[in-house]
C-alpha cells in the first residue's frame, strides 16, 4: 500500500469575463495527474515555471480546491479538509520554495527546527536538542548555528 496515491488530479481556475462577470473558460493548472508516493522516501517535483508543481502540493495539503480526482492517504480517501485526520496534518506538510521569506528572521535556528518537534513530538529538552543537532548535521550545519538567528545564516 502506498503512503499517498493521487489519481486523475484536476485543479482548474475559472476565467471570468463579459458584462455579468460570468465564467467564460478555465485555466487547467493541473489536469489528470497520477502520482504514487511511498513512505520513507524523498521526492522532488520538477517542472517549468507555471507547470503546476506548487498547485499539486497545495492540493495535497488542502490549500487548493480539487476539481476532480482522488487523494488517498494510507488507504483512506481524503475528500474534504474538515474530514482530514490529525495524523494526516502531522505527516503531510509543505516546504515553501522561498525559504528566506518564509522563516522568521527574529527566531533562532534551533527554534525554527524544533517547532515541529514541539508541536508533534513529546521530547525532553535534551532529546529535542539531540534531534535538532542530528537535523543540522544532515544539512551540513554545526551545532554552533543553532543559536544563530535566521538573518545571520
Regions found by a protein language model. Name each.
Residues 99-113:
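Conserved catalytic motifs of ABC-family nucleotide-binding domains
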Residues 46-48:
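The feature captures the beta-strand-to-loop junction immediately N-terminal to the Walker
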Residues 14-23, 65, 80-82, 109-127, ...:
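ABC-type ATPase nucleotide-binding domains, specifically the catalytic core motifs of the NBD
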Residues 61:
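Helix-to-loop junction immediately C-terminal to a conserved catalytic motif
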Residues 127-145:
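Conserved ABC ATPase "signature" region
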Amino acid at each position: 500500500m502506498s503512503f499517498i496515491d493521487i489519481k486523475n488530479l484536476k485543479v482548474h481556475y475559472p476565467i471570468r469575463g463579459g458584462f455579468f462577470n460570468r465564467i467564460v473558460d478555465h485555466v487547467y493548472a493541473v489536469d489528470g495527474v497520477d502520482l504514487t508516493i511511498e513512505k520513507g522516501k524523498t521526492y522532488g517535483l520538477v517542472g517549468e515555471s507555471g507547470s503546476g508543481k506548487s498547485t499539486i502540493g497545495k492540493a495535497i495539503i488542502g490549500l487548493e480546491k480539487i476539481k476532480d480526482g482522488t487523494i488517498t492517504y494510507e488507504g483512506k480517501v481524503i475528500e474534504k479538509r474538515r474530514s482530514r485526520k490529525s495524523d494526516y496534518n502531522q505527516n503531510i506538510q509543505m516546504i515553501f520554495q522561498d525559504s528566506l521569506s518564509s522563516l522568521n528572521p527574529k527566531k533562532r535556528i534551533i527554534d525554527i527546527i524544533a517547532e515541529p518537534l514541539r508541536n508533534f513530538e513529546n521530547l525532553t529538552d535534551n532529546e529535542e536538542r539531540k534531534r535538532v543537532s542530528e537535523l543540522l548535521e544532515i544539512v551540513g550545519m554545526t551545532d554552533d548555528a543553532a543559536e544563530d538567528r535566521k538573518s545571520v545564516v
